[in-house]
């Protein structure tokens, strides 16, 4: 069993994670964890991770005015919850935004600039997604 938490308000989301855990769901992910309507704080992310969920951080447009601030917030949250429960992704590809490969590369570079090691980046961008998908 697996589950994805996306686009659900926080109280219902945590309730679904608890119920998923109780029902034996093995793989869960909270997508866009810091974005509305979920907008989790670090304590809530830690609770979700303890329930077995991965926490996803989505590197959207690196050219937006708030990109640096957003990346700073992501980095602070990841340092607290840990790379072992973190997944990095992008949802770029819309017209007017960078290509997904370019935007994701910029996101990874921004995390390196904020002190994350290559080992951390590999874990969050490759190994953890593979675990979530049951490939590892």
Where do the language-model regions lie?
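Catalytic alpha/beta core domains of metabolic enzymes, predominantly
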Residues: 64-67, 96
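Divalent metal-coordination and catalytic microenvironments
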Residues: 3, 55, 91, 121, ...
């Amino acid at each position: 069993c697996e589950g994805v938490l996306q686009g659900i308000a926080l109280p219902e989301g945590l309730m679904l994670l608890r119920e998923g855990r109780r029902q034996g769901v093995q793989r869960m992910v909270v997508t866009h964890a810091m974005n509305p309507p979920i907008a989790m704080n670090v304590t809530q992310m830690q609770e979700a991770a303890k329930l077995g969920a991965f926490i996803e951080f989505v590197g959207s447009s690196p050219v937006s005015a708030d990109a640096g601030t957003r990346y700073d917030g992501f980095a602070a949250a990841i340092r607290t919850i840990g790379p072992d429960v973190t997944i990095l992704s992008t949802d770029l590809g819309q017209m007017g935004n960078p290509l997904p490969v370019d935007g994701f590369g910029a996101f990874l570079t921004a995390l390196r600039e904020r002190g994350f090691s290559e080992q951390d980046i590999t874990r969050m961008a490759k190994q953890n997604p593979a675990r979530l998908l049951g490939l590892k």
